[in-house]
Amino acid sequence: KKGKAVQLRGISSHGINWDVGEPFVNEKALQNLRDEWGVNCFRVAMYTEDYNGYCVTDTASRKKLLAKIDTAVKAGRKLGMYVIIDWHILSDGNPKKNQSKAKAFFKKMSNKYRKEKHVFYEICNEPNGGVQWKTIKSYAKSVIKGIRKADKNAVVIVGTPTWSQDVDMAAKSP
């Protein structure tokens, strides 16, 4: 931040797709997390397929998900907090399954939030089901290309195989 290292201290929503998450994605909730728990980063976990996920839901529900993301981004800006927009895969396991939707989603998000330096993009959380790093890496290059067109300095987080446990694979072949 302004040339200085930042230590992120954060918490993740459990999935903005669930109605039970509604009370927790708003300015008051984020302010409480910041003031009472010392949180400076909020991860907006949006499932892609599970729980009426972004890739499988109807247009009206998709608009609600985008509105929740926007609420978190605006609250984060006002409160001086970082916000991670998380493409949360679970049963889909392999991020390539919804690659075209991910590319369109992150193109939209990175264009909308390109001036919001407190916004980070997590383009595939916890790949699983035996997907290999080379597959994730190929997916990541494709999605990141679109993000970089909007914001060449955006922070992008890429999950690794086995629910993001195999970080050594990414370290060996970034």
Regions flagged by a language model, labelled:
Residues K1, A5-Q7, G93, Y121, ...:
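Intrinsic structural disorder
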Residues G15, E22, Y82, Q99-F120, ...:
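Extracellular glycoside hydrolase catalytic/binding regions
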Residues L30-Y113, K117-V119, I123-G129:
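Substrate-binding cleft and catalytic face of glycoside hydrolase catalytic domains
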Residues K1-R43, V56-T59:
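N-terminal carbohydrate-binding accessory modules
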